[in-house]
């Protein structure tokens, strides 16, 4: 499965400037997702991080990974929400700068009842720039 931005907006409860997924190029529901974030000079976070030396904040790379995890889960569910429970083993290996295309891959490595553990990686031009493990839970929305 692939998703364009209009389909992504229906799955993720975020909006500009906090929606950090532009496109999903591959999705196997509840198993894996490959998503793209086009990093442009116009990103609002570059104003202060850092003037004259713009670098995408690591916390926003992890947020993009978490949003890819939401898509992995929500692509097969309706009337549910996904909540972040923990981030572990986050590592930032190279800076992400304007003009980069961030390729995010998330894979479910453990699932139990309403929780999923994801192994997440971010690459730019084939080079690993960040990685983390994310634990998330699903909860049915109240009517």
From Swiss-Prot:
Enzymatic reactions: a (3R)-hydroxyacyl-[ACP] = a (2E)-enoyl-[ACP] + H2O
One example of a Gene Ontology biological process annotation: lipid A biosynthetic process
Chief localization: cytoplasm
Residues annotated as the enzyme's active site: 49
Cellular-component GO terms for this entry: cytoplasm; membrane
EC number: 4.2.1.59
Segments crossing the lipid bilayer: none
Compartments, record wording: Cytoplasm
GO molecular function, one term: (3R)-hydroxyacyl-[acyl-carrier-protein] dehydratase activity
Keyword annotations: Cytoplasm, Lipid A biosynthesis, Lipid biosynthesis, Lipid metabolism, Lyase
Highest taxon, organism lineage: Bacteria
HAMAP family for this protein: FabZ
Family of the protein in this entry: Belongs to the thioester dehydratase family. FabZ subfamily.
Function: Involved in unsaturated fatty acids biosynthesis. Catalyzes the dehydration of short chain beta-hydroxyacyl-ACPs and long chain saturated and unsaturated beta-hydroxyacyl-ACPs.
Official protein name in the record: 3-hydroxyacyl-[acyl-carrier-protein] dehydratase FabZ
Organism: Ehrlichia chaffeensis (strain ATCC CRL-10679 / Arkansas)
